[in-house]
Amino acid sequence: MLASGSKGNATYVSDGSTSILIDAGLSGIEIQRRFDTNGLCPEDLDAIIVSHEHSDHIQGVGVLSRRFNIPVYISRKTKEASQHLGSIYDLRYFECGTAFNINNLLLHPFSISHDAVDPAGFTIEKSGTKIGIATDLGIATLMVKEHLKECALLILEANHDPD
């Protein structure tokens, strides 16, 4: 976890051969500093995945994508609502409910409760092991619980209050 909270979110996931960043909600310089502090290299990222359009999740996406030639995966609705994303090196779309691969990782995006256009949580699977990530989770709906069942690791940020 590189950052979590209303000032910025960024979660690094790697299996040793494929590395992804879920959200880049800090400046590109700050994310690069946090990578350096943790002995990581942003140029080794295979993808940046965007959960939703709020600035604390997308602030550094465009800069990192352009600087290190990193593909960005985002839903179409989130892209349309993202006013401060900037230009992207390689834009790829996903849809909640439809799994997709990044190299040897299988990602399952699913809808979550949050005050955004098309907010997504994710499970990431490899060789039968599954982890789950859901940020700004308002309500753990039955669908969310179903997706997060049997995760070996679960990362939840539940600071969104729908009321």
Enumerate the language-model features and the residues they cover:
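Active-site neighborhood of phospho(di)ester-bond hydrolases with catalytic His/Asp-centered motifs
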Residues: 22-25, 45-53, 73-76, 132-135, ...
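Cap/insert and terminal regions of metallo-dependent hydrolase folds
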Residues: 142-163
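Active-site metal-binding loops of divalent metal-dependent hydrolases
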Residues: 2-3, 24-26, 53, 112-115, ...
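Alpha-helix C-terminal capping/helix-to-coil transition sites in glycosyltransferase folds
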Residues: 44, 102, 149-150
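Active-site metal-binding motif and surrounding structural segment of the metallo-beta-lactamase
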Residues: 29-74
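Conserved beta-strand hairpin/beta-sheet module of binuclear metal-dependent hydrolase folds
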Residues: 1-38, 120-136
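Metallo-beta-lactamase
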Residues: 75-128
